[in-house]
Amino acid sequence: MIPADIKQLLAAKHHDPFQVLGLHLKDEKWILRLFKSRVKEAYVIINEQRMPMKRLPATDLFEIELTQHYPVQEYIFETLNDDNQLSRFHDPYCFSPILKDEDAYLFNSGEHFYAYKFMGARSYSQNDINGVLFIVWAPNASRVSVVGGFNYWDGRIHPMRSNGASGIWELFIPDIETGHPYKYEIRNRDSGDISLKMDPFARETEYRPATASIIPSSDDYKWADQKWIAKRTDFDWLHQPLSIYEMHLGSCQKAEDGSYLSYTQIAEKLVPYIKKLGYTHVQLLPITEFPYDGSWGYQVTGYFSPSKRFGNPHDFAYFVDYLHQHDIGVFLDWVPAHFPKDDHALANFDGTGLYEHEDPLLGEHKDWGTLIFNYGRKEIHSFLISSALYWLEEFHLDGLRVDAVASMLYLDYSREAGEWRPNKYGGNENLEAVEFIRKLNEAAHARYPGALMMAEESTSWPRVSHPTYLGGLGFSMKWNMGWMNDTLKFMSLDPIFRQYHHDKLTFALMYAFTENFILPLSHDEVVHLKKSLIGKMPGDQWQKFANLRLLYAYMFTQPG
């Protein structure tokens, strides 16, 4: 008769595998258990003595009775697989919990701004045994397992330990190395449905269309941009020239065979071009990992992963470092407003709307076909702010351009009557998003002086670039979308008709000093058949170039 808890384990439904696997005292005897599929024989080696383990009939569970307790350092498993290959490994289920109560508390409270330092997968050593520690948040799961090639993607082999009310799961797997693809297999506690998910905190991912996370290398990049960082700290960005070159790494330049260049190749080609044109900074369209090329990076699945299209995290660090050494700053377009519905990523992560609102009137962008973060959930604050600070801390970025802020601020953004829910006061302001944005900007400014937080905000929301202690949102600067739209409409007119539209020029001056504005000529204005800038200009070729020169001169001399 198989005990109920072992049946639960064999069915991959046990909430706490540490109650069954590992070494346990029962009836004054020590029972050591191992679950391992695709093996013919299993042994335990203690003090160089090799002892066979007994297979539970018709299962992949092995056990042996021992006369005493042994620390995990003093025994090791050995298995013989179906191909007659021997392998040795330590027991993952005889280690103590590793997650600190303080980390779990701060994460659940929305106050852990460096959660990436303990969440996700990372190299770890416990009891002088090396391996990888996995930690994931899935509060509505009944069982979470780490799966990968190292366990045949079998969710029964490495089920994780629940940390209780925090909703966080952990498992230290000894003897595995970096570079392996992995995912989490998650069983929902109510429906029993099983899903395979990439790690939300993964620092590296597979090259699309593959979707697994990769156990990151523990090697630290050796930075050489100390002079730039020291200078940036004292940079008076309000009164110094700031000329930004916006670029999309996937299309700026490609190899002769049409493939992507690497971060390192782009850096070395980019520097002389940027220096020649006199730009002070480059701004990258999102390189946080994304599955669909056509999204330009704005449908993010890996908030801590530089896109594998162009290389690994070490390569991206080189990109930033190389530009810094040549006195060029680097900004990144960062997308906390929404995320895609791809099954392998954040959507319905533990079988519920964990990262998103389950209510479609709050949780879905119909225009973009994406999901909206649930800013009222404190763990989302920890997740997103940790992502923002990760790029500033680990990759020395000089600032973030926060995408689609207007869609975060308004509950009725791009919605008709009856398609949205008002806030508790009956208004259309997303109060939870406002709280999140202020917390984000306060955290970034306090920790990274000189780094800029820039808002792409297309409405007249007041005090976007004012400090939070003055009632503002706390951004450093705001994109002046109104100036861009009005100016491009004016410049596209035939000069004969411009005299009737001077309001397109004068209106921007009426509010020019209400915010710290950046004057943009955005990628959004040259896509979807909107024509290039020179294509928008009227007249023949000579006149088009003359008008474009006028546009640039007007832009650079605009008061503000």
Where is each model-derived feature located?
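Short beta-strand elements bearing conserved aromatic residues within extracellular beta-rich modules
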Residues: A42-V44, V144-V146, Y182
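The feature marks proteins involved in alpha-glucan
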Residues: M1-K29, M51-A138, Y152, N163-E246, ...
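Short proline/glycine-enriched turn/loop motifs at strand-loop junctions of beta-rich domains
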Residues: F35-E41, W137-V144
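Conserved alpha/beta catalytic core and glycan-binding cleft of carbohydrate-active enzymes
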Residues: H396-D398, E416-G560
